[in-house]
Structure formats: C-alpha cells, structure tokens
C-alpha cells in the first residue's frame, strides 16, 4: 500500500482561511465583538446633546466620545459654535470620570472656572470656583440663574433641598480643600503656573483639564482649527488688531530660551462665519501649556502631561508630588502636522529688500514651478520675460480650473498680496542657483590662477579666501541669502527637573494608607448602594446586633454608675474616645463627632448660601448696601427657597413675611447673626431657627455615654406613647422627642397640657435638651428615635448623665436623613444594646393590615425581614380605606374633622392656599395639613392623603413613606389623587385589595 506524507501546518497556512468553517468562525467572532461593543455603549452614561450638529461635527464628537458615552444627538436648537459647546459637556463628564464618584466628602472635585449650574442640575459632587473677572463672567452668572430657575420650575421635587455649590472667588483664594480638580478651558486665564498655585492653595494633587490646541501657534501668527471651525490670530494687545509680525527666529528665541517679550501678545479665537462672541486670551498663559514641563511651589512639584489631542482639543493632567525630586531630563515634542507638506519661502517685506518675511508654500507647487523656471531660464533674456513665465506657472498651479464641466482647485490659492513677491523670490532663487552652478563649473575648468589657488594647502586657501572677502566685500557671493527654508514638523523641549522639597515622600506608607481608607470607604459605599436599592421601595430594617449584650446598670446600683462615670472621666475628648478599647464607647464617640461635624457643615452651608446671594445682589464685606438687580436675583432664588427675603434699613421687607414666621438671624456684611430693625440684611429658610453651630459646639464639649441603649421596635400604632405614659417616673425620667409636634402630643398624653411648666420640663425635644439648662436624670425615654441621629441621641444621654435610654420607634418608618447631600454620613443609625419587637397595632383598622403586607411584598427586596409581614390588628374597625380620583385641588373636600397629609411641600402649599380661599380658620391650615414626614408619630381619626400631580415622585414608591401615610388613621382613610402616577404603591395596593 502506497503511503504519502504532508505538512498540516503548511496546508492550514495556505488554505485554512479559504474554508467555510474558518469564515463562519471569523464572522461569529466579529459579531460577538461588535455585540459587546454595542452593549457596552448602551450601558454607558446617556449624554444628551441638544445643539444642532452637522454631519462632520457629529462624526467628530462620536469618534471622540462615542465609545465611552451613549450619545443622543437630539438636534433641538441652534447654538453658537455648537460643536465646541457639545464637546465642552463631554469634556466635563470625561474629566470627572477620572476621579472617584462616590459622593463622599473626601472625593469632592473642584472645578476651576466651570459652569456651576451644570454640576447643580446633574447632582455632581463638585465645588465650582467661578470668579467674576469681567462683564462676561457676570453675564454668565445671570444666565445660569435663569437656566436654573427654568429647569427647577419644570421639576421642583427633584431639586427640593439641593443648593448650588460654588463661590465667586478666584481659584487661588478659595479655601475649599479637595484632592481632585478639573479645569475645562479655564487655564487660559491662569496659565500652567497659575493652575499649580491654585492647586497648592486647595491641597489638590491631581487636576485634569482641557484647552484648545494648535501646535502651529509656536510657528505662525494665525491659523485655523478646522474641526472647531475656529480661527485664531495673535494680536499685539487686547484692544488692538495689529498683527504680530515678529520674525521666526525671534519667536523661537522668545519661546524656547526667553520668557520676556517687549509687548503683551494676545491670541484671539474667532469662530468662522459666526458673528458671535469671540475669546481673547494671553499668549503667555497659552504658551505655558505648550512649553512648560514642571513647576516647584511651596514644597510641591507639579508636572504636566499632555494626554490626548483630538479635534483641536488637548486633554492634559497636572499632578503634584511632595518631597525631593532628583534631577531628571523631561522631554516632550510639539508636532506641526499642518506644515509637513510645506516649505518656507523668504519674500521681501519691503521694497528696499532690507526686511524679509517667511511664508509657507506648498512643496509640490514650488517643486513644479522651480522645475519649469530652471528649464526656461535664459541668461540672455530680459528678467521681465522670465518673471512672467514664473508668474504664469504660479497662476496655473494655484487657480481654479474646469475639466469636463467640473471645477477643480489646482494647488493652493496664494495670497494676492504675496503673489508677485513669491514670483520674484523664485526668480532670484533660480538666478542664484545658476550663478552657483556656473561658479562650480568655472572652478572645475579653472585658469592658472585657480590652479595656483588649488595648489595651496587648505589652511592657506581658507586664510586667503577670508582676506579677500574682508577686503573686497562686493566680490562676496550672495549664497548667504537663502530663499528656501526647510520647515521642521516638530519642536522639542528639554528641561531638567530637580527640587529639594525637604523630607522624602514615603510612597509606601501613602499606598498603605490609601488602600486602607479605600477599603473602608468601599465597604461603606457598598452598604449604601444596597441600602439605596432597598430604599427605592422601602426603608431597610435595622438588624439586631450580634454582639453579646452588656449588663445594664440601674439607678439601684450606685457603685456601678460611679464606675462608669470614672471610666469616662479618664478620657480627654471625643477624639480620644473613638480609640477606646470599649467598642460601644468608640462607636458612640464617633457618631457624636459625625453629628457635630454635620451640624457645623449645615451652618457653614447656610453662611455660604447667604453670602452667595449677598454677593450676587451686589453686596460686599464692607458696606451695608446692595447694588444690583435685586428682583431678578431674589425671584430666581425664591423658586428654590420661598423664605428668601430682604429686610431694608427702613424696616420693610421685599416680600411679605409669611404669617407666624419670625427670623431669628440674618446675613449682611457682618456675617450671620441677630440683626436690628435699622439694618439691611437678607434671610432664607435657615434663618428662622439657626442653631446648627450651637448644637455642634455643645456636642463636641460632651463625652460619649456608657449607659445602656434599649430599643423597642414596634409597628405603627402598637402603643409606644401608651408605653411611655405607663413607665414614666418624674423623679428619674425625662421624655425626649425628635420634633416639636411629637413633644406636644406626648405632653398632652402625660399632663393633659402642651405648654404647662411641668409638661415643658419633663418632655423636651432633643435640640432643647442640648441647647438649654436641664436637670440630670438616670433614665431617658425617647419617642420616634429613628428620626434622631445616633450621635445626637448619645449627646442627649451625656448631657442628662443618663445611665439608660429606652427608645421607641419603628425602624421601617421614615428614618433620619441628611439635609446635606455632600456630607459623608456613616454613623447616623441607632446602634442599640438591647432590642425588642412589638407586632400588634391598636390604631390601624383591620383592612390596613393586608394592605401594608401587600406593600411590603411588592416594595421590599426579596429576602428582607419585615415585622409587617406578620403584624396583627386589635382595632374594631374593619373597613376604612377608600380612594377617588379628582381633577384639581378645588375638588378636595376640606373638612375640619379630617387630617390632611401630602407627600410633597408643593401639594401642601396648594392645600393651604385652597383653605385660605375658603376662609377656613388659621388653626386648620396650620395644624391639620402636614406632609407625611411631618406627620410621623401622629394619630388621627380621619385622614386624607392628597396627590395633586402625576409627575414623577419617588416618595410614592418608598415603603417607609407609604407606610407612614397609611397608618396615621383610626377610623377612615381616603386617598384623593389627580391622574395616574406610575409606580404609585398605595394606589396599586388599594386597587388590588
């Protein structure tokens, strides 16, 4: 049997790609890769570009950011330089994405010169430094106020309680500290060194920014950035359009070797065919981003890296490092791709041929023109005839020609002012070349003198030639006049970086610290994400601690109490207590410090907001006067805070003060504090009760308590107030509530009076305990404890010197929430030592029980333990819940026997306005109309929940808010709503019941 052999590898290499299976496999792999790219793009952040963009502009922005963001080009409106504006938004998001987006305070990002309204509307964790350097900046602020008002009016619930975070100080003068910063086209006014100094002032280590970039700025006096349709030009000053005609050698010398110029050169950016605002910036600042490498300032060394240059926009980053920097050669290049096909041609700039200038000329055109000029050159012809030949070739190579009815551009059009001088320069160049070639030929065919000269040694020939040239300058050949100059396509910059910053930077320790901190923050964020996922529909349940229960000291054991007090007295401060080996002491001290910091930040935010309004209205830190469009400014802020107002020195207010409102403090040039009737000052809603700073100071002065915290976690209506009433002992106890309304209810239950001296002594709010003198007690009873910050509860125990706190509350109802979204809140939840449950309600009717069970099933994540899945009712009322649709607020049946609740302040305001129109008594709309949050802990016979809008409102999806709304009544509950709201948990459950 014959045998044969073959090489399988050769066969696969030569024929494998032709097989059907190979083609199918390639097609499948390509399809999978394309599908992955498409799915990744769809998962990216959605960015809506409203500006109308052409086909080329759309390609530019998609090529740059299409792979990172899910771009939606809606083509809604024409805007000045639309592509530049669209790119600016994407650049802002791109630079922000370089930094952690946790929302934690330690991940705050600064924006030097950015648009604060963009960050405000998107909820970014960003502080903007937006100084008013001129009329344009003030115009932008006014426009941003208008835009903010317009958007808030369309969706006020989304922005309820949110404040814009910005200042009007220059970047180097703002005192906000942050590790990260961005600068979107903000470096033009500061330069590289100015940005570094601003970073140093803010404690910033990494900055990422963008700016318009054209490498030809290092060579030319004017140019075009084609992708942006932008034309730039160097001018002598900001108020003169005189062209900068500094010779090339002078430009390179001043650029590379010297930073001193005889005049201030500006760069004007104009957008072609757009009669809109242009921009003028200092060339020194722009050039610094092209030439500078490093800068050492106050113990830090800052280095710039140019990351991406695309579509005329350069993205760069500046990183600051401490300590010593050993010598290192830093090198970078600037390329000029726009001149790689050109050659420099020197032409006369004046008729006396003294001044010459360099123009760029297309290499291909010059080569063909020079070729024809050399072939047609005749020394016997008049120079004019040869000049005409060259001009004819130039015209043919730079004109529009028509071939078969189609017009085509041959070469590149020449400036009409340079046309004749270019022809003359080529003529002189041709003549000089022929003369040089003639000399070479004559030297080859030399005479006896030439042979004698050639017989000399080289040193003698050089000496003799130099003597002849010095004695007879007219005999000197003209080859030193070079008409053609080879243009370099790049310029290099070499700089030696060396800085002695003192102590060496311990990178290893820094890495360990950052890793530890990141793990801690990551765990917190993971917990917060899980919590937010659950809170979309319900408030998560606080699980019982797994730690072993500590023995609870009682008033009957004085020795144990004294021991506890001695243990605390050995610790110097809350900061020291956070390191206590006793876990619960450390936890409580940490929570108290966080609560103090939170109240301090609320105070600082109030001052900052009022100062911003004061400055926007034309005020300053020296005069008691405002100069500006007060009505426009305050009308804009009024949409966010209806309590914003101005008190004039005449004693009058700009807007009527709401009835029953008394402002305790105001703000003017002297800051925030009590004001007199003869002063000009401004106020907002925080000026009615302004005790945040006092609460912070008091909390910091206390020490963490060591007593036992017991929590009774009961369902709504389980008799928490009744339990407080049954165990209350005036000799040893004090009742503390989270708010004034709860305090009044408990006072009525205990003392049948809400304002008697006895009632006000033994039943107080937590704020009242901390801010006023109060007797010490051994036990504190807390109502609605979930509305308190854990640190505030600990501060109350410490102030009262209580050894035991019995806390009543429902962990599944509305809990304490931060009023400052930028504050990094971690320790607000109550950590009890003992926990007990109560699952029987005496208030809620029978039909509410299955409704709440259904809500818990629909809203809470699967696997979540809730006491409402097994709660029972002892009420004798079997049916209480009804609902009806209404078309407007006028159809709401306002009855003094009913209690009205709303989810939003806007609906509450509408009901109050309707009550005033119906001339109902003040006590009705002051006491019988509340929000769900305000009504937590209230018990009424007849309750009506009102929803007047069908716009998106996440509160109707949250289990905690719906639970409070549905469990306030004893006899009847009516749900009156306008329209259909997607995700309305209460409406869906009532419909299914």
UniProtKB/Swiss-Prot annotation:
Q: What subcellular compartments does it reside in?
A: Host endoplasmic reticulum membrane
* Keywords from the UniProt entry: ATP-binding, Helicase, Host endoplasmic reticulum, Host membrane, Hydrolase, Membrane, Methyltransferase, Nucleotide-binding, Transferase
**Which parts of this chain are annotated as the region Disordered?**
543-576
Give yes or no: UniProt keyword Methyltransferase. yes
Listed GO CC annotations: host cell endoplasmic reticulum membrane; membrane
Q: How does it sit in the membrane?
A: Peripheral membrane protein
Sequence ranges assigned to domain (+)RNA virus helicase C-terminal in this UniProt record: 839-993
Q: Which GO terms describe its molecular function?
A: ATP binding; helicase activity; hydrolase activity, acting on acid anhydrides; mRNA methyltransferase activity; RNA binding
According to the record, the residues making up region (Methyltransferase) are: 51-409
The EC designation for this entry is 3.6.4.-, 2.1.1.-
Q: Which GO terms describe its biological process?
A: methylation; mRNA modification; RNA processing
* Residue ranges of every copy of the Alphavirus-like MT domain listed in the record: 72-290
Domain (+)RNA virus helicase ATP-binding, residue spans: 684-838
- Cite the SUPFAM superfamilies for this sequence: P-loop containing nucleoside triphosphate hydrolases
> Which residues are recorded as binding ATP?
714-721
Subunit (UniProt): Interacts with RNA-directed RNA polymerase 2a.
Q: What does this protein do?
A: Involved in the virus replication. Contains a helicase domain and a methyltransferase domain. The methyltransferase domain is probably involved in viral RNA capping. Involved in the formation of ER membrane spherular invaginations in which RNA replication complexes form.
State the protein's name. Replication protein 1a
Which species is listed as the source?
Cucumber mosaic virus (strain Ixora) (CMV)
């Amino acid at each position: 049997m014959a045998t044969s052999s073959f090489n399988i590898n050769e066969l696969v290499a030569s024929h494998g790609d032709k097989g059907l299976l190979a083609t199918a496999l390639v097609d499948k792999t390509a399809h999978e890769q394309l599908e992955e790219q498409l799915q990744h793009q769809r998962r990216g952040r959605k960015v809506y570009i409203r500006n109308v963009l052409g086909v080329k502009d759309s390609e530019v922005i998609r090529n740059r950011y299409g792979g990172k963001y899910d771009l939606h080009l809606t083509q809604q409106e024409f805007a000045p330089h639309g592509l530049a504006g669209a790119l600016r938004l994407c650049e802002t998001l791109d630079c922000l994405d370089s930094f952690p987006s946790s929302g934690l305070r330690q991940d705050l990002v600064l924006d030097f010169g950015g648009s604060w309204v963009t960050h405000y509307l998107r909820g970014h964790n960003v502080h903007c430094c937006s100084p008013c350097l001129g009329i344009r900046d003030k115009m932008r602020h006014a426009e941003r106020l208008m835009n903010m008002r317009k958007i808030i009016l369309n969706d006020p619930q989304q922005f309820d309680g949110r404040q814009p975070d910005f200042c009007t100080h220059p970047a180097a003068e703002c005192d906000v500290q942050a590790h990260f910063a961005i600068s979107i086209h903000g470096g033009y006014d500061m330069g590289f060194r100015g940005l570094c100094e601003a970073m140093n002032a803010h404690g910033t280590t990494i900055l990422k920014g963008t700016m318009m970039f054209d490498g030809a700025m290092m060579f030319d006096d004017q140019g075009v950035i084609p992708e942006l349709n932008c034309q730039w030009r160097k001018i002598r000053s900001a108020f003169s359009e005189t062209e900068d005609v500094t010779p090339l050698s002078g430009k390179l010398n001043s650029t590379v070797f010297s930073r001193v110029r005889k005049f201030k050169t500006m760069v004007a950016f104009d957008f072609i065919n757009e009669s809109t605002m242009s921009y003028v910036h200092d060339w020194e600042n722009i050039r610094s981003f092209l030439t500078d490498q490093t800068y050492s300032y106050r113990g830090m060394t800052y280095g710039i890296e140019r990351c991406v240059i695309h579509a005329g926009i350069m993205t760069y980053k500046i990183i600051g490092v401490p300590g010593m920097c050993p010598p290192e050669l830093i090198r970078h290049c600037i390329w000029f791709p726009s001149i790689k096909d050109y050659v420099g041609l020197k032409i006369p700039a004046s008729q006396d041929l003294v001044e010459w200038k360099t123009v760029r000329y297309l290499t291909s055109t010059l080569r063909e023109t020079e070729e024809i000029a050399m072939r047609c050159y005749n020394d016997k012809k008049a120079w004019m005839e040869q000049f005409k030949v060259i001009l004819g070739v130039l015209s043919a190579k730079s004109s529009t020609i028509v071939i078969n009815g189609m017009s085509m551009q041959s070469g590149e059009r020449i400036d009409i002012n340079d046309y004749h001088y270019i022809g003359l320069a080529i003529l002189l160049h041709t003549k000089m070349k022929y003369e040089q070639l003639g000399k070479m030929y004559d030297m080859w065919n030399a005479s006896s003198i030439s042979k004698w000269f050639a017989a000399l040694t080289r040193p003698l020939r050089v000496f003799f030639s130099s003597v002849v040239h010095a004695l007879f300058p007219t005999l000197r050949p003209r080859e030193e006049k070079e008409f053609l100059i080879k243009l370099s396509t790049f310029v290099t910059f070499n700089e030696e970086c060396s800085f002695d910053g003192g102590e060496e930077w311990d990178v290893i320790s820094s890495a360990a610290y950052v890793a530890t901190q990141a793990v801690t923050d990551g765990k917190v964020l993971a917990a917060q994400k899980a919590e937010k996922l659950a809170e979309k529909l319900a408030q998560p349940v606080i699980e019982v601690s797994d730690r072993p229960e500590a023995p609870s000291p009682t008033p009957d054991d004085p020795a144990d109490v004294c021991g506890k007090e001695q243990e605390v007295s050995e610790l110097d401060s809350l900061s020291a207590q956070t390191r206590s080996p006793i876990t619960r002491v450390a936890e409580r001290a940490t929570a108290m410090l966080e609560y103090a910091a939170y109240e301090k930040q609320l105070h600082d935010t109030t001052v900052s907001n009022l100062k911003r309004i004061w400055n926007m209205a034309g005020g300053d830190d020296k005069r008691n006067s405002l100069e500006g469009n007060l009505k426009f400014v305050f009308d804009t802020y009024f949409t966010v805070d209806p309590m914003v107002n101005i008190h004039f020195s005449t004693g009058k207010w700009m807007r009527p003060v709401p009835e029953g409102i008394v402002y305790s403090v105001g703000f003017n040039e002297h800051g925030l504090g009590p004001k007199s009737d003869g002063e000009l000052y401004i106020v907002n809603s925080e000026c009615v009760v302004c005790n945040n700073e006092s609460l912070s100071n008091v909390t910091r002065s206390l020490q963490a308590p060591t007593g036992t915290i017991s929590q009774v976690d009961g369902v709504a209506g389980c008799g928490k107030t009744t339990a407080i009433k049954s165990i209350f002992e005036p000799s040893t106890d004090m009742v503390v509530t989270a708010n004034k309304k709860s305090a009044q209810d408990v006072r009525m239950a205990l003392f049948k009076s809400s304002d008697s001296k006895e009632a006000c002594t033994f039943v107080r709010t937590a704020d009242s305990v901390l801010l006023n003198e109060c007797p010490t007690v051994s036990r504190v009873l807390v109502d609605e404890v979930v509305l308190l910050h854990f640190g505030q509860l600990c501060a109350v125990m410490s102030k009262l010197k209580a050894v035991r706190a019995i806390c009543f509350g429902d962990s599944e109802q509305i809990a304490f929430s931060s009023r400052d979204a930028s504050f990094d809140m971690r320790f607000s939840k109550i950590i009890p030592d003992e926990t007990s449950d109560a699952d029987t309600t005496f208030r809620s009717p029978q039909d509410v029980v299955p409704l709440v069970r259904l809500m818990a099933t629909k809203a809470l994540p699967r696997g979540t333990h809730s006491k409402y899945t097994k709660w029972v009712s002892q009420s004798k009322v079997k049916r209480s819940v009804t609902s009806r649709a209404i078309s407007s607020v006028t159809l709401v049946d306002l009855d003094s026997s009913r209690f009205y609740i709303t989810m939003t302040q806007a609906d509450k305001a509408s009901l109050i306005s309707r009550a005033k129109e119906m001339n109902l008594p003040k006590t009705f709309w002051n006491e019988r109309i509340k929000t769900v949050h305000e009504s937590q802990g209230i018990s009424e016979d007849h309750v009506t929940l009102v929803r007047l809008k069908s716009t998106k409102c996440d509160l109707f999806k949250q289990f905690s808010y719906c639970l409070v709304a549905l469990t306030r009544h004893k006899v009847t509950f009516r749900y009156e709503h306008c329209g259909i709201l997607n995700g309305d948990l209460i409406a869906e459950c009532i419909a299914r019941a």
